[in-house]
Design a protein with these regions (language model features):
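Proline-centered flexible-loop/turn and helix-kink motifs
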Residues: 23-27, 124, 150
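Short loop/helix-cap segments at secondary-structure boundaries that form the rim of catalytic
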Residues: 165-166
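N-terminal auxiliary segments of SAM/dcSAM-dependent transferases
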Residues: 2-65
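Short N-terminal micro-motifs specific to bacterial/archaeal maturation
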Residues: 24, 28, 79-82, 146
Length: 166
Protein backbone atom coordinates (compact mmCIF):
# COMPACT_ATOMS: atom_id res chain seq x y z
CA UNK A 1 0.00 0.00 0.00
CA UNK A 2 1.20 3.49 -0.70
CA UNK A 3 2.18 5.75 2.15
CA UNK A 4 -0.60 8.26 1.34
CA UNK A 5 -3.31 5.59 1.37
CA UNK A 6 -2.01 4.23 4.71
CA UNK A 7 -2.12 7.73 6.13
CA UNK A 8 -5.63 8.22 4.74
CA UNK A 9 -6.77 4.91 6.26
CA UNK A 10 -5.31 5.86 9.64
CA UNK A 11 -7.06 9.26 9.55
CA UNK A 12 -10.36 7.54 8.69
CA UNK A 13 -9.93 5.10 11.59
CA UNK A 14 -9.20 7.99 13.95
CA UNK A 15 -12.27 9.85 12.71
CA UNK A 16 -14.46 6.79 13.38
CA UNK A 17 -12.94 6.42 16.87
CA UNK A 18 -13.59 10.10 17.67
CA UNK A 19 -17.21 9.83 16.51
CA UNK A 20 -17.77 6.69 18.60
CA UNK A 21 -16.20 8.34 21.64
CA UNK A 22 -18.34 11.44 21.12
CA UNK A 23 -21.57 9.43 20.84
CA UNK A 24 -20.66 7.39 23.93
CA UNK A 25 -19.79 10.48 25.99
CA UNK A 26 -22.40 13.01 24.89
CA UNK A 27 -25.26 10.72 23.75
CA UNK A 28 -25.82 12.46 20.42
CA UNK A 29 -24.23 12.31 16.99
CA UNK A 30 -20.84 13.89 16.48
CA UNK A 31 -22.24 16.19 13.79
CA UNK A 32 -25.13 17.40 16.01
CA UNK A 33 -22.90 17.95 18.99
CA UNK A 34 -20.14 19.66 17.07
CA UNK A 35 -22.62 21.98 15.37
CA UNK A 36 -24.19 22.90 18.71
CA UNK A 37 -20.80 23.36 20.35
CA UNK A 38 -19.49 25.59 17.58
CA UNK A 39 -22.69 27.66 17.60
CA UNK A 40 -22.24 28.28 21.31
CA UNK A 41 -18.55 29.01 21.02
CA UNK A 42 -19.12 31.33 18.06
CA UNK A 43 -20.43 33.92 20.53
CA UNK A 44 -17.05 34.32 22.22
CA UNK A 45 -13.38 33.95 21.49
CA UNK A 46 -12.11 30.45 22.05
CA UNK A 47 -9.10 28.26 21.44
CA UNK A 48 -9.98 25.27 19.29
CA UNK A 49 -7.06 23.36 20.79
CA UNK A 50 -8.38 24.02 24.30
CA UNK A 51 -11.90 22.94 23.33
CA UNK A 52 -10.64 19.75 21.68
CA UNK A 53 -8.55 19.01 24.78
CA UNK A 54 -11.64 19.47 26.97
CA UNK A 55 -13.69 17.18 24.72
CA UNK A 56 -10.92 14.58 24.79
CA UNK A 57 -10.99 14.75 28.59
CA UNK A 58 -14.79 14.23 28.57
CA UNK A 59 -15.61 17.68 29.94
CA UNK A 60 -19.37 18.15 29.50
CA UNK A 61 -20.41 20.51 26.70
CA UNK A 62 -22.32 22.58 29.24
CA UNK A 63 -19.10 23.34 31.14
CA UNK A 64 -17.21 24.06 27.92
CA UNK A 65 -19.89 26.53 26.84
CA UNK A 66 -20.20 27.87 30.41
CA UNK A 67 -23.97 28.10 29.98
CA UNK A 68 -27.00 25.94 29.24
CA UNK A 69 -30.70 26.27 28.62
CA UNK A 70 -33.14 25.04 31.24
CA UNK A 71 -36.91 25.44 31.08
CA UNK A 72 -37.42 29.04 29.88
CA UNK A 73 -34.02 30.41 30.85
CA UNK A 74 -30.36 30.36 29.96
CA UNK A 75 -28.07 29.62 32.88
CA UNK A 76 -24.42 30.31 33.55
CA UNK A 77 -22.66 27.14 34.68
CA UNK A 78 -19.28 26.00 35.88
CA UNK A 79 -17.88 23.00 37.68
CA UNK A 80 -19.14 24.34 41.04
CA UNK A 81 -22.77 23.60 40.08
CA UNK A 82 -24.50 20.58 38.62
CA UNK A 83 -25.70 20.65 35.02
CA UNK A 84 -29.48 21.12 34.77
CA UNK A 85 -31.13 17.96 33.47
CA UNK A 86 -34.11 17.90 31.11
CA UNK A 87 -35.86 15.50 33.51
CA UNK A 88 -35.80 18.21 36.18
CA UNK A 89 -38.03 20.37 34.00
CA UNK A 90 -40.79 17.86 34.81
CA UNK A 91 -40.31 18.68 38.50
CA UNK A 92 -40.51 22.42 37.79
CA UNK A 93 -43.75 21.90 35.82
CA UNK A 94 -45.19 19.81 38.64
CA UNK A 95 -44.42 22.48 41.25
CA UNK A 96 -45.81 25.28 39.09
CA UNK A 97 -49.02 23.36 38.36
CA UNK A 98 -49.63 21.92 41.82
CA UNK A 99 -48.16 24.34 44.33
CA UNK A 100 -49.18 27.74 42.97
CA UNK A 101 -50.96 28.59 46.25
CA UNK A 102 -47.80 28.13 48.33
CA UNK A 103 -46.54 31.41 49.75
CA UNK A 104 -43.03 30.13 50.47
CA UNK A 105 -40.93 27.60 48.60
CA UNK A 106 -37.51 26.33 49.65
CA UNK A 107 -34.95 24.90 47.20
CA UNK A 108 -32.27 23.00 49.14
CA UNK A 109 -28.92 22.55 47.41
CA UNK A 110 -29.86 25.12 44.78
CA UNK A 111 -26.60 25.04 42.79
CA UNK A 112 -27.05 27.27 39.73
CA UNK A 113 -30.46 28.31 41.04
CA UNK A 114 -32.22 27.20 37.86
CA UNK A 115 -35.07 25.35 39.59
CA UNK A 116 -35.86 28.13 42.06
CA UNK A 117 -35.50 30.85 39.42
CA UNK A 118 -37.79 29.16 36.90
CA UNK A 119 -40.40 28.62 39.61
CA UNK A 120 -40.06 32.26 40.70
CA UNK A 121 -40.79 33.41 37.14
CA UNK A 122 -44.17 31.63 37.19
CA UNK A 123 -45.25 31.86 40.84
CA UNK A 124 -45.05 35.61 41.25
CA UNK A 125 -46.91 35.62 44.59
CA UNK A 126 -44.49 33.18 46.20
CA UNK A 127 -41.38 33.97 48.21
CA UNK A 128 -38.72 31.55 47.02
CA UNK A 129 -35.51 30.81 48.90
CA UNK A 130 -32.60 28.74 47.63
CA UNK A 131 -29.86 27.42 49.89
CA UNK A 132 -26.47 25.99 49.15
CA UNK A 133 -23.39 25.20 51.19
CA UNK A 134 -21.09 26.44 48.40
CA UNK A 135 -20.28 30.15 48.15
CA UNK A 136 -19.17 29.63 44.55
CA UNK A 137 -22.46 27.99 43.63
CA UNK A 138 -24.36 30.90 45.19
CA UNK A 139 -22.29 33.39 43.15
CA UNK A 140 -23.50 31.60 40.00
CA UNK A 141 -27.08 31.44 41.33
CA UNK A 142 -27.12 35.16 42.11
CA UNK A 143 -25.85 36.01 38.62
CA UNK A 144 -28.50 33.74 37.09
CA UNK A 145 -31.11 35.38 39.34
CA UNK A 146 -30.91 38.62 37.34
CA UNK A 147 -33.27 37.13 34.73
CA UNK A 148 -36.25 36.92 37.12
CA UNK A 149 -38.70 39.71 37.93
CA UNK A 150 -39.46 37.84 41.19
CA UNK A 151 -35.91 37.34 42.48
CA UNK A 152 -35.05 34.33 44.59
CA UNK A 153 -33.43 34.90 47.99
CA UNK A 154 -30.24 32.81 48.00
CA UNK A 155 -28.69 31.92 51.36
CA UNK A 156 -25.44 30.22 52.31
CA UNK A 157 -26.75 27.38 54.45
CA UNK A 158 -26.21 23.73 55.25
CA UNK A 159 -29.76 22.61 54.52
CA UNK A 160 -31.99 24.25 57.16
CA UNK A 161 -29.29 25.69 59.44
CA UNK A 162 -29.77 29.31 58.29
CA UNK A 163 -33.50 29.12 57.52
CA UNK A 164 -35.68 31.09 59.94
CA UNK A 165 -39.05 29.89 58.74
CA UNK A 166 -40.33 27.44 56.23
Amino acid sequence: MQRSSLKSKKIKEQEIAVKKAWRSTYKNSYEEGLYFLLQGLNEEEFSLDKVLHQIKNKIPIQYILKKWFFYDGEYILNNHVLIPRPETEVLVNHIIQNFSSCRTILDLGTGSGCIAIEISKKLLNSKITGTDISKRALEIANTNNLQSSNPVNFILSDWFSEIDEC
